[in-house]
Regions:
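Short, functionally important structural connectors and interaction interfaces within domains
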Residues: 1, 18, 47, 51-52, ...
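Long amphipathic alpha-helical segments used for membrane anchoring, targeting, substrate engagement
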Residues: 1-28, 32, 81-98
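Residue-level signature of catalytic and energy-coupling elements of molecular machines
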Residues: 12, 48, 71
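N-terminal intrinsically disordered, cationic/polar leader segments
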Residues: 32-53, 59
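A short, polar/charged loop-to-alpha-helix boundary motif
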Residues: 60-69
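Stable alpha-helical structural segments in soluble proteins, enriched in small hydrophobic residues
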Residues: 70, 74-85
Length: 98
């Protein structure tokens, strides 16, 4: 009984250590989201920190709602990619428990 408990604690500590490594790795992986027309590009890390936003100069002459929509689409695409990347990395550690 206590042997199982020791083994479970050991596994939990190992998983915690691996999770720290994954978290650090996610901080260095960059993903991009691009608007449908390519006029806006957002770069963020896989831990969902925005690194850069690029707006094509031709987009700047558009109406505000067009610019807003392009930024929204690019951000959402980058977030989706960051979530997918993060989930894949975490699944490798947790065995699909996430």
């Amino acid at each position: 009984m206590f042997g199982n408990m020791k083994e479970m604690l050991k596994q939990a500590q190992n998983m915690k250590s691996q999770m720290k490594k994954i978290k650090k790795e996610l901080e260095s992986i960059e993903v991009e989201g691009i608007s449908a027309n390519g006029a806006c590009k957002v770069t963020m890390t896989a831990d969902m920190k925005t690194q850069n936003v690029e707006i094509n100069e031709t987009l700047l002459s558009s109406e505000a709602y067009v610019i807003e929509n392009a930024i929204k689409v690019a951000v959402n695409n980058a977030l989706e990619d960051a979530k997918d990347t993060s989930a894949k990395k975490l699944k490798a550690v947790t065995g699909g428990l996430t």
